[in-house]
Regions:
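Short low-polarity hydrophobic stretches
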Residues: 1-3, 56-57
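A gly/proline- and charged-residue-enriched helix-loop-helix capping module
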Residues: 2-48
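Active-site loop segments of alpha/beta catalytic cores
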Residues: 29-168
């Protein structure tokens, strides 16, 4: 994907996404970075042991909403979320499976916490309807949190903007 940056020092926006077909039939263009699953757990644990007096957070960070924007472009993703094509669900499942495997591997290390992020809010409100967030994204976040807790880890979630409409969830 190609990012367009209109202001120096500020992250850009995808203007030429990888997935351009409305049915997501070209989603095979997207590379799921399986190689990130090959890190050395023992090496991470040795590093953690050297910093036993510190609170250590894993070196991975699932961000499904932002990743989908990078892959599809913001406007196209918003349309997909309103009327999701079958290919969208298939890709989302594949991406979520990858993130779960990555978190499980990090959960095997001696870090104190796992983390995830997605920037959900504008200055005034959530970027999508809270009901769509609850249906599509909340179950993934729940899985990520469950992985952390099942391994005795804390989970941190970063988000920017006004997210008050989903905080009670």
């Amino acid at each position: 994907c190609v990012f367009t940056n209109i202001q120096r020092g500020v992250i850009g926006e995808v203007k030429h996404p990888l997935v351009t077909e409305d049915d997501w039939s070209d989603a095979d263009k997207v590379h799921i970075p399986e190689e990130y699953l090959s890190f050395d757990v023992d090496q991470v644990n040795r590093s953690c042991a050297q910093r036993a007096d510190k609170f250590l957070i894993a070196g991975c960070c699932p961000r499904p909403f932002e990743q989908l924007q990078f892959i599809r472009g913001t406007v196209n993703l918003y349309m997909d979320l309103m009327d999701p094509p079958k290919g969208f669900w298939a890709f989302l499942e594949k991406m979520h499976d990858y993130y779960c495997r990555l978190l499980k591997k990090w959960a095997q290390t001696d870090v104190d916490a796992l983390n995830m992020m997605d920037d959900w809010g504008s200055q005034n409100s959530l970027l999508i309807n809270p009901k769509i967030w609850e249906k599509v994204f909340m179950p993934m976040y729940r899985d990520y949190i469950d992985i952390a807790h099942a391994h005795g880890k804390k989970m941190f979630m970063h988000s920017d903007g006004n997210t008050l409409s989903i905080i009670p969830r």
